[in-house]
Amino acid sequence: MNQIEFEADLRRQGYQVFYGGLQAGMVNPDHAHDWDARVMVIGGEITLTRAAKAETFHVGDNCAVAAGEVHAERVGPQGVAYIAGRRNAVG
């Protein structure tokens, strides 16, 4: 799925779409959100740790984080740019 398709899919599923980025080396310790999130990396990389399992996402990769899911974020050495979707938790 490319960036245009990803954005269209987010909108179809009721996500608010925005573009963002984080600085190189930034670490965000364990936390959770009150919303469902989907993210596609469009520059750099980010590692998410969930349930003690780390997974690194590179350009073109995408992931979903459900509302209430505890996770940590570690940004790669060149930062990360992304397109993201956010929507109120379903249910």
What are the residue ranges of the model-derived segments?
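Conserved short histidine dyad/triad with adjacent acidic residue
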Residues: 3, 16-33, 67
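Transition segment at domain starts
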Residues: 1, 7-11
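Ligand-binding loop in jelly-roll beta-barrel domains
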Residues: 67-91
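Short histidine-centered beta-strand/loop micro-motifs
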Residues: 9, 27-33, 50, 74-75
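Short acidic-glycine-tyrosine-enriched beta hairpin
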Residues: 51-67
